[in-house]
From Swiss-Prot:
InterPro entries to which the protein is assigned, alphabetical: TBP (IPR000814), TBP_archaea (IPR033711), TBP_CS (IPR030491), TBP_dom_sf (IPR012295)
Organism annotation: Methanosarcina mazei (strain ATCC BAA-159 / DSM 3647 / Goe1 / Go1 / JCM 11833 / OCM 88)
Gene3D superfamilies recorded: TATA-Binding Protein (3.30.310.10)
Keyword Transcription annotated: yes
One GO term (biological process): DNA-templated transcription initiation
NCBIfam families found in the cross-reference section: PRK00394.1-2, PRK00394.2-1, PRK00394.2-2, PRK00394.2-4
Superkingdom classification of source: Archaea
Sequence repeat locations: 8-84, 99-177
Protein known as: TATA-box-binding protein 2
Family: Belongs to the TBP family.
HAMAP family: TATA_bind_prot_arch
Entry keyword Ubl conjugation: no
Molecular function GO labels: DNA binding; DNA-binding transcription factor activity
Length: 183
C-alpha cells in the first residue's frame, strides 16, 4: 500500500472537560482566546505545540480540530485541562475523547479518467458533476468514509474515525480502480 499511503491532514475530536464553563473568565485568562457570543456560541482558542484549535462551549464540551494525529489530540486536550486547572477551573479527570472525523490525503500517482470511474463504480455511491466540482465523490460503506477522487490521482478521505479507516478507504478505491483496469 506504499503507493497510496495516507497523510493525515486534520483530526477532529470532542470531549467534555467540565459540567460548565464561564467563557468570559477563560477568555480573560487565556491569551489569544476569542469569544463573541453574538457571532458564535463558543470560545475559540488556538495552540501551537502541537498545533490545534479548540472550540470551548458553556456546556463544558470542547471540540479540538487541526491536529495532525490522534496522539496530538490527546496531548493538546490534556494540556488544555491543565491550563484550565491552573486558572482555578476544575476539569474532569480522564475525560473520554471521541474522534469525530479524520481527513487524510493520498496520491495514486497516476492520471485518472473520472468519467470512466463514475460509470465503473455505478451511480448509487458516487456524485460526479464536473461543472460544479472537479472531483468525484465516492461514498464507501465499509469503512464508512467518503473519498474525493481527482483526475490528478489525488484523493481526499473524510469521515474516518481512525487512521486505519482512511487507509482502508484508499485501499478500497485502489483495488476497485485496479479491478476496472483504470490504474
Amino acid at each position: 500500500m506504499s503507493e497510496s499511503s495516507i497523510k493525515i491532514e486534520n483530526v477532529v475530536a470532542s470531549t467534555k472537560l467540565a459540567e460548565e464553563f464561564d467563557l468570559t473568565v477563560i477568555e480573560s485568562q487565556f491569551e489569544g482566546a476569542e469569544y463573541n457570543k453574538q457571532k458564535f456560541p463558543g470560545l475559540v482558542y488556538r495552540v501551537s505545540d502541537p498545533k490545534a484549535a479548540f472550540l470551548v462551549f458553556t456546556s463544558g464540551k470542547v471540540v479540538c480540530t487541526g491536529a495532525k494525529n490522534v496522539a496530538d489530540v490527546h496531548t493538546v486536550i490534556g494540556n488544555m485541562a491543565k491550563k484550565l486547572n491552573s486558572i482555578g477551573i476544575k476539569t474532569m479527570e480522564n475525560p473520554q475523547i471521541t474522534v469525530q472525523n479524520i481527513v487524510a490525503s493520498a496520491d495514486l500517482h497516476t492520471i485518472l479518467n473520472l468519467n470512466a470511474i463514475a460509470i465503473g463504480l455505478g451511480l448509487e455511491n458516487i456524485e460526479y458533476e464536473p461543472e460544479q466540482f472537479p472531483g468525484l465523490v465516492y461514498r464507501i460503506d465499509e469503512p464508512k468514509v467518503v473519498v474525493l477522487i481527482f483526475s490528478s490521482g489525488k484523493l481526499v478521505v473524510t469521515g474516518g474515525k481512525t487512521p486505519e479507516d482512511c487507509e482502508s478507504g484508499v485501499e478500497v478505491v485502489r483495488q476497485q480502480l485496479d479491478n476496472m483496469g483504470l490504474l
